[in-house]
């Protein structure tokens, strides 16, 4: 359900200031920060603030700052999720003027009063990674892929916006992620490492940061890569953190609990929070960790909270559109919590929603469906690819399950069926086709697999049942399966394509990311700019140096 936004005061203030500036003949652009010029690296970035920067003081300095980062989330993930939600609500992904933006279940941030775009390249590639892009967002500097908050030489470290807000202004700091707390994006707000894979060292820096609230997935390598180091959780407790590893313990935390590390009681692939499709009823969603963070951080000193929807990226790497859309919606639900807080403190709160890069090369449109989409088909997917791997594929391998038996599970869990099974379902009165309405191509929305698709699935089944860790994939096999379980990724590929969407990669792409802003200083984030400017805009708004 969408939240009502109290935006009138902010918009009126911005308009009043704009008129005043016009009357006074004030220049549209502001002088570039001196720190901006110091950020030049082997791949120089544009660090000039957008023209709207002159309006940055229109609503004052934000006392409460929320920075939501959808890892791997760019325009395709946002738009496909919003279209999908519209299709579920209206029976079609189309509608009248503004219907996609205005429908009741639209993403909570999609019509924030200010929207911008940020380019994402790093010093290595136009297709950057999370370590370097999060470094750009948190410090205003470009660096190599895989490096966190250090320069290309690995000798100069950069102080993050979170560290500066804590040290210079006394803000409380929260870091929340649906993946591991020492993964690249959350780490980029508190650590400084040449390699994002130095998980134990990153964990040590997490403890040394003395940030107030960490919440999300478990720490990777908590006793070191060789499992011979002091346990990070014990070190955190020794440093004064309350380590909550059950939901009951997390629920018991409050404003007077002091520093806390909260680990999801229900852990899934890679010791992360489960995909939203797999989350058990009654267990915390990303939004619940944000709610608890507000409870623990709110106070006279102000706070900064970074919230990462990290499983969006993981789902896109695996080309799992159903999980991608569900986790993008989960991020939107977390933003809803911040909107509720904003509505209580509209003059003191800034909410930013962005991505670090795009993952997977997701597209709305597929050659096999021409101009049509059948997005409701994705609602037939009941679990993520990861849960299918652990709960089903592992059993298939162990028990030698036949292809015919596997097809029964595919129909139950993903809606994909054979012509024979679909005929029986029709006799039983079961309807599985998309209800999206289109002027043509209705039959192409069917969930009945063609002979071509069925052959692809059987080939993938055979590969899954016979391959070992030593199996080397051919170029053709890699393009078909990437590094994923052939059966699982082929199922999601077929369902994606029958829904009218597709992926072009198992890696990151070079698309710009959206930046949505609402609240104090929102005008700074309008326009097209570099991702480093997100840092410089926050620094300008808060006055940190």
Label every model-predicted segment:
Residues 1-12:
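Bacterial N-terminal signal peptides that target proteins for export
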Residues 19-23:
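C-terminal motif of bacterial Sec signal peptides marking the signal peptidase cleavage site
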Residues 25-28:
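Bacterial signal peptide processing site
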Residues 30-56:
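Extracellular mucin-like PTS domains
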Residues 41, 47, 177, 349, ...:
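Ser/Thr-centric signal marking residues that sit
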Residues 45, 59-81, 137-166, 171-188, ...:
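Mobile, glycine-rich extracellular loop/lid and propeptide segments
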Residues 57, 99-101, 177:
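PP2C/PPM-type serine/threonine phosphatase catalytic domain
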Residues 62-64, 73-78, 82-135, 183-545:
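A post-motif C-terminal structural segment
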């Amino acid at each position: 359900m969408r939240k009502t936004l109290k935006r009138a005061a902010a918009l009126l203030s911005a308009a009043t200031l704009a008129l005043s500036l016009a009357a006074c003949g004030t220049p549209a652009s502001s002088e570039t920060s001196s720190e901006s010029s110091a950020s030049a690296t082997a791949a120089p970035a544009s660090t000039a603030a957008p023209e709207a920067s002159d309006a940055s003081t229109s609503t004052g300095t934000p006392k409460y700052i929320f920075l939501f980062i959808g890892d791997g989330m760019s325009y395709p993930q946002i738009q496909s999720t919003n279209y999908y939600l519209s299709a579920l609500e209206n029976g079609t992904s189309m509608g009248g003027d503004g219907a996609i933006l205005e429908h009741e279940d639209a993403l909570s941030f999609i019509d924030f009063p200010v929207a911008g775009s940020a380019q994402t390249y790093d010093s290595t590639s136009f297709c950057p990674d999370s370590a370097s892009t999060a470094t750009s967002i948190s410090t205003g500097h470009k660096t190599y892929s895989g490096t966190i908050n250090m320069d290309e030489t690995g000798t100069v470290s950069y102080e993050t916006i979170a560290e500066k807000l804590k040290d210079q202004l006394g803000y409380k700091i929260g870091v929340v992620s649906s993946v591991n707390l020492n993964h690249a994006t959350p780490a980029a707000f508190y650590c400084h490492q040449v390699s994002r894979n130095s998980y134990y060292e990153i964990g040590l820096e997490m403890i040394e940061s003395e940030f107030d609230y960490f919440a999300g997935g478990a720490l990777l390598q908590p006793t070191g890569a060789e499992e011979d180091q002091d346990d990070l959780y014990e070190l955190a407790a020794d440093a004064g953190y309350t380590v909550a590893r059950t939901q009951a313990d997390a629920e018991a935390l409050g404003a007077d609990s002091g520093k806390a590390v909260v680990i999801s009681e229900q852990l899934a692939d890679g010791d992360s929070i489960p995909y939203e499709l797999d989350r058990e009823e009654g267990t915390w969603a990303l939004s619940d960790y944000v709610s608890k963070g507000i409870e623990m951080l709110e106070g006279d000193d102000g706070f900064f909270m970074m919230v990462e929807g990290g499983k969006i990226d993981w789902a896109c790497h695996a080309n799992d559109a159903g999980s991608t859309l569900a986790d993008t919606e989960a991020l939107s639900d977390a933003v809803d919590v911040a909107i509720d807080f904003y509505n209580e403190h509209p003059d003191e709160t800034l909410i930013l929603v962005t991505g670090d890069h795009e993952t997977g090369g997701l597209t709305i449109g597929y050659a096999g469906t021409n101009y049509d989409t059948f997005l409701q088909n994705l609602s037939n997917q009941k679990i993520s690819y990861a849960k299918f791997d652990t709960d089903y594929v592992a059993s298939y391998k162990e028990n030698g399950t036949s292809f015919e038996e596997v097809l029964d599970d595919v129909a139950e869990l993903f809606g994909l069926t054979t012509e024979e099974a679909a005929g029986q379902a029709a006799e039983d009165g079961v309807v599985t086709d998309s209800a999206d309405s289109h002027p043509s191509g209705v039959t192409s929305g069917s969930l009945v697999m063609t002979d071509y698709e069925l052959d692809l699935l059987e080939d993938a089944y055979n590969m899954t049942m016979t391959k070992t860790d030593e199996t080397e994939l051919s170029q053709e096999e890699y393009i078909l399966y990437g590094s994923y379980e052939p059966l699982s990724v082929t199922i999601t590929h077929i369902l994606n394509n029958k829904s009218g969407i597709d992926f072009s990669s198992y890696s990151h792409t070079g698309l710009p990311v959206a930046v949505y802003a609402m609240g104090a200083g929102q005008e700074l984030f309008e326009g097209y700019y570099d991702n480093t400017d997100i840092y410089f805009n926050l620094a300008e708004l808060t006055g940190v140096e």
